Amino acid sequence: PATPSRTGGVRMADIGDSGVSFENVAREWRCKYTPGASGGPGDSASLKACQDLLTEYLPKLKELPKASVTRQVCGGCMDFKVSITQPLEEHGAWAGADYGPLEEEFIAKLKAIDGVSQVETQEITFEAL
């Protein structure tokens, strides 16, 4: 259940009786990229293509209401992740629209990158503690 704020809007939600409360939700887009000839990320063509795709979509993602965008890259396990975090209310509106049209477009282009695999999406709570 959500806890109303003093102004009547929703501020926090609880995950049952777990003691976990949150006010922000992130939509994560992730994949595995292939290492370059060196065996690492520095010369990875697929990592460069992932970054180029994110650069293309970043202005559109930042236009989402109250969105913050983070990127995580692991050079050891070859992860490329993008998280779009919004307060509950704003995220709910985007989720209600099936994350369209940005997610469908981005994921289709991500899947088309040579060397990219395990393309997935996930909705997660995201809190600074």
Residue ranges and their predicted role:
Residues T3-F80, T85-E104, K109-L129:
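Short S/T/G/P-rich N-terminal loop/turn motif that feeds into the first structured element of a domain
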